[in-house]
């Protein structure tokens, strides 16, 4: 175990090629496996980009280095200075002949979870030992794809003229209604954790910043315990002025489509590691109305009346019928939040949309109400008190342009891109009713 | 007031050039000012990218449109279809002859804060009416520069092989010590809001993800009320494995330098709007030791003994002496957090650094302790109980590589880039002891 490392890494495993035969490299990582066969030892070193085989014949490396290597155990952290030896039979066409070894840190054994194990442990055990679970290439692949997706989303939004903002997560009053909020003790006062940046991004539409986005945590004190919900999530939020629901849907299509393309082009190795069939969606997604959606559900034997929110069963029935990504539009005003703009001709329906992937809702958006009187009326209609919305409502009095926006769940979008069934697979340290650690 | 807009914007004000003489455009924004001089009306329309002059001679626009325009008031939201008329005497060399007007929304008057006013109101009034305050180009410029900075920071980190992560803000136990935490009621349990992603990003160093970054809110229940502190802030955090403090400082220099360059190159207009002298820093920043720093302070008559943290007075004295950006290194171990790696030769000092801009600390970092026994010993030495760190400590038992990292305050960095004296100028909706709204 060392306090100060002798070297710096010169190459990740994936950067070494057989053509580098004879070249000296320094590699660093974890002992993925070690096998001593008499006078030769095989060590597989694992780093972020893959694995590399180190072959140490006693005769070539000498007694001292040989016995040093022999003492290594699984998951020890090592640095190896060695020579690249092209070898057609070795994995990736080369192996490393070690010249010098530094044991950087050792691993206690047995491990509570073995990263080299083929059969994965139960999810709960894995989450308890997330730092070991994350050593498995399949698990790391999910988070590399997630990072790529976030990068792609921001690039699309920058290109579309959006400005990044940070809105507060500590808020004074119960807002929006609907979802439960977590209360905080804020000095002498009570405050709450923001369930979404909705009211703030709308207020920003009155500023002339025009197009804003934020990627940040949201907090929902909902009691349900499903494979699609967490109490802390990462939300990709946009809001755009001088725009309607159709404009917002166009941006959402670009964001989602480009993320698929960027993951496909830049994360081929991770897609392969996950062993998934990765297909690019069309550039434009199907659009069905709420009416059509409930017709599909009813036709499949799931009873649902007009005006009801889609039950889990209805979502599943519709998801079976629809392929990949699709919008559901023209929702009943009754079941959408107070700030949703009603349709001009038929105020019973509104300019809201959900973006679905099969049976999973990944985004929700709408054109919002920008007219003060209509907004106050709608707040009251939902049984809420306009007095709780003073600051928000102020922004609608002095020149608020029409605007629209959406929230896209980063965790759920990662589920779609990596084809995971449980949202906990796509969050490093998930938070649910039961789990608040690590 | 309209529910559905007739048109979409074809050009922002800044996109229109005198060479477009005769071309038809649709512009949208707020009535910045209106002046009727008998049979001619001048309207200045303001959008995100600037202002444009609309000139409406009664004789040319006709009675109906003329009287429509005459009724406009300050801060009404309008769309104008008009013709570009090159005119050397007009601002930017052109004006717009209106052909058609749509009043999209009206503004109640008087305004609680006038965006067109030359003399700004008190900060408190401005923050109360932030949506109006943000209509002022000088205020918007700060947030455009902030967005540019965040984009630049991420680009540098992507280029340096960092992966973006999201760590939880809801945490189970009082961690780190030092700063006060906000308690949350989490279903049946008590939880806390994360004061920094420190322990999580360190745990991730045991995973092999190697280089991670996160830009996210942090929450500190500190009681002080200064121009440099907020209770909710945005922190840019990185952590890198197989690295020491010097490696982390190199990355920090690149991140900060590149952000200066990107703001300088891409936000010239905003720099001009702010009226600031914007100078690029050198690529490498000066480095002084803590010992040298207290010598400077003492020489300037600020009494400070070795082992004390730098007082505000000491920071000011040192800031007067040092120019621009500089590191302070080799801090006494006593005054740095428990996870800071002590120096091999002299454990009284440690591998910590602060990045200062004049008298403002904008970043703090260190090589961390990766050795389990030393870490436990240090936790105890600081009077903390290792039992409170179970999950964190587990990650150090099974192969933790040496690692280093830093946190860079996004709000403070924005202060530096925009030359603001109060952190509240650089946060859309600041949170302090007194302010929890809007």
UniProtKB/Swiss-Prot annotation, chains A, B:
Subcellular location: Cytoplasm
Cofactor binding mode and count: Binds 3 Mg(2+) cations per subunit. The strongest magnesium site (Mg1) is bound to the beta- and gamma-phosphates of ATP and four water molecules complete its coordination sphere.
Residues annotated as binding ATP: 220-222, 228-230, 361, 409-412
Listed EC numbers: 6.1.1.23
BP GO terms, sorted: aspartyl-tRNA aminoacylation
Domain of life: Archaea
Catalytic activity as recorded in UniProt: tRNA(Asx) + L-aspartate + ATP = L-aspartyl-tRNA(Asx) + AMP + diphosphate
Name of the protein described by the UniProt record: Aspartate--tRNA(Asp/Asn) ligase
Sites where the protein binds Mg(2+) 2: 361, 364
Record site: Important for tRNA non-discrimination: 91
GO CC annotation, single: cytosol
Assembly behavior: Homodimer.
Cofactor(s) the record lists: Mg(2+)
Region: Aspartate, residue numbers: 198-201
Gene symbol of the encoding locus: aspS
Similarity field: Belongs to the class-II aminoacyl-tRNA synthetase family. Type 2 subfamily.
Organism: Methanocaldococcus jannaschii (strain ATCC 43067 / DSM 2661 / JAL-1 / JCM 10045 / NBRC 100440) (Methanococcus jannaschii)
